[in-house]
Amino acid sequence: MLMAQMLGDKFSILMMWDRWKMLYTKTLGELGMEHKCASMRSIGVTPDNKSLLAGKEDEVFPLLLQAAEKCVEEDGAQVLILGSTTMHEAHFWLSERIGVPVINPGPLTYKLASIALDLNLTHSKATWPTPLSPKHDMIRAIGAAGAAYLEGKQ
């Protein structure tokens, strides 16, 4: 959401299903960004965390485009956010067709973390103390998966 504000004034969130709306509403409130969200639109498709959108492109991609067009034309969104990494396969396809920036949260988060590491930036320990039980293996696995994904895109 913060990146969306760097790219435009108003943004919309595309969701797979309505069950996630409360999570975005909560985050918007915590960030004080309710007034910057043009809309949240669901395509009414239950997310598939295993096969994602594979084999469903002909069904799901047009639904995403239809919702995205409503976000831009009816709601005034200047930036779109894919509300879940389960939609990442539609990012390039949708970006080519909609005319406004489309944020893909997975690769963006990976790149931001990489930049922070390169610049030796870390969180404020005054705000966020060191965890009692660090999960180093999990963090390494997330980093490796992100790197593998980006290598496959180049």
Language-model segments: residues:
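Short, flexible loop segments at boundaries between secondary-structure elements
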Residues: 103-122
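Active-site rim beta-loop-alpha module in soluble metabolic enzymes
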Residues: 19, 27-83, 90
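Short, glycine-/small-residue-rich phosphate/pyrophosphate-handling segment
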Residues: 5-42, 116-154
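Short, structured coil segments at secondary-structure junctions
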Residues: 7, 97-98
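Catalytic cores of alpha/beta
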Residues: 89-96, 115
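Short, acidic/turn-prone active-site loops that include or flank metal/cofactor-
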Residues: 1, 16-19, 105-110
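Metallocofactor- and cofactor-centric catalytic cores in central/energy metabolism, strongly enriched
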Residues: 70-72, 76, 95-96, 128, ...
